Swiss-Prot record:
Species of the source: Haemophilus influenzae (strain PittEE)
SUPFAM superfamilies assigned to the protein according to its UniProt record, in alphabetical order: Actin-like ATPase domain (SSF53067)
One term of GO molecular function: N-acylmannosamine kinase activity
Listed HAMAP family: ManNAc_kinase (MF_01234)
Alphabetically ordered keywords of this record: ATP-binding, Carbohydrate metabolism, Kinase, Metal-binding, Nucleotide-binding, Transferase, Zinc
Protein's recorded name: N-acetylmannosamine kinase
Underlying gene: nanK
Length: 300
């Protein structure tokens, strides 16, 4: 089956035909920044028209929370005016093909899980440490999306009850400590301020302040991993994102994991899919749901 896959992010919308896990005719446009609701309707309509007659179903990976086809977020400000946007209905105006939607981190998780031996790894987690911290959870070989679409928002578990206020409104979330945004919140206040990329450059040069800041992030992720393993019996975790894949970061996470009893640990690896993980994962997931639900019922 041919899939029109869409990956909707805060700054870009990627689209491609996905067939047998291969991406064709990929294009990318900017996410609307002005008149965002009407702009998004128009952008989706144009993308559907561009690929008309070339797909059998539509799969969407999107930032935020997808619940009954509606786009929302723990922090609505992250959507730039698109909170409560009728994403599925907007797409359905332009096609009668089946449509499936899920969160972009959930989609990336499903893509990464395709690389695993499901007989050996039935419980799997993907963690992305980037501007924010997100992820997805596979239990008993099934991607967990939840009744409200929020399953896998692991960046909003507690890291420090006395920590900074997170964008979601809660104090001390993992995201408020480990993310690129959290790193920059500290480094931008230094006498010699810098962005997260330079923080890691200084870290690799053994700068004391940068090292402490990166270690703080890595410790939070190590504790998150331990919590996931002990609560869900996770067998393997893949880590991605611009922070998660930064040179030296994963080894720090593994170092802090070694301080825990072994029962809190599992195999850790770097994520293999890059920027197209959402496109590929969404295409695979919706196809699998279609096969499992012959009547055509699609989640999202």
């Amino acid at each position: 089956m041919r899939c029109l896959a869409l990956d909707i992010g805060g700054t870009k919308i990627a689209a491609a035909i996905v067939k047998n896990g291969e991406i064709e005719q990929r294009q990318q446009i900017h996410t609307p920044r002005e008149n965002v609701v009407e702009g998004m309707h128009q952008a989706l309509g144009k993308l559907l028209a561009d690929y008309e007659g070339q797909f059998d179903y539509v799969a969407v990976a999107s930032t935020g929370i997808i619940n009954n086809g509606i786009l929302s977020a723990l922090n609505p400000k992250n959507l730039g005016g698109l909170a409560e946007f009728p994403l599925k209905a907007s797409i359905a105006k332009h096609t009668d093909k089946p449509i499936g939607l899920l969160n972009d981190a959930q989609a990336a998780t499903y893509a990464e899980y395709q690389l695993q031996n499901s007989e050996q790894v039935s419980n799997f987690v993907f963690i992305t440490v980037s501007t924010g911290v997100g992820g997805g959870i596979v239990l008993n070989q099934i991607l967990q999306t939840g009744s409200r679409g929020i399953a896998g928002h692991i960046g909003h578990t507690l890291a420090d009850p006395n920590g900074a206020i997170c964008g979601c409104g809660r104090r001390g979330c993992v995201e408020a400590i480990a993310s690129g945004r959290a790193i920059e919140a500290v480094s931008s206040q230094w006498e010699d301020p810098c962005d997260p990329k330079e923080v890691f450059e200084r870290f690799r040069k053994n700068d004391e302040k940068a090292t402490a800041l990166v270690e703080r992030s890595a410790k939070a992720i190590a504790n998150l991993i331990a919590d996931l393993v002990i609560s869900l019996d996770i067998q393997k975790i893949a880590i991605g994102g611009s922070v998660g894949l930064a040179e030296g970061y994963l080894s720090l996470v593994e170092k802090y994991l070694q301080d825990f009893p072994s029962i809190y640990c599992c195999e850790i690896e770097t994520a293999k899919f890059g920027q197209d993980a959402g496109l590929i994962g969404a295409a695979y997931w919706v196809k699998d749901v279609l096969l499992d639900k012959p009547e055509g019922t699609i989640y999202g």
